[in-house]
């Protein structure tokens, strides 16, 4: 019984180690709405049906507003095996948000 519990627990640790929460802002370099993917700061980001997209005020908006050279803030999970970030929430930003301005955007951590 102990061995079975240990194996299940150990495998849970392994899966958890392959995914990390990430939060960052950056410039959209490419966007492929058909394949639900984009490159932000040279990082591959994908989204799915659960991903939320909001404007800078936190109000919901649509994925067709994603355009190259625009700034975004991404909250997601880095999947090490696939070398990509699965976005949980995407925020459209007016520009790069520096330390002094972060208080204006409560979602930026």
What name fits each language-model region?
Residues 49-57:
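Short, structured beta-strand/loop micro-motifs enriched in basic residues and often containing a Trp
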Residues 1-44, 56-109:
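Short, flexible, surface-exposed loop segments at domain boundaries
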């Amino acid at each position: 019984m102990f061995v079975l519990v240990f194996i299940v627990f150990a495998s849970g640790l392994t899966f958890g180690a392959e995914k990390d929460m990430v939060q960052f802002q950056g410039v959209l370099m490419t966007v492929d709405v058909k394949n639900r993917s984009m490159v932000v700061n040279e990082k591959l980001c994908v989204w799915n049906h659960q991903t939320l997209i909001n404007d800078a005020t936190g109000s919901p908006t649509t994925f067709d507003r994603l355009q190259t050279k625009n700034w975004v803030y991404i909250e997601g999970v880095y999947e090490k095996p696939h070398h990509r970030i699965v976005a949980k929430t995407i925020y459209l930003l007016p520009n790069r948000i520096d330390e002094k301005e972060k208080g204006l955007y409560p979602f930026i951590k």
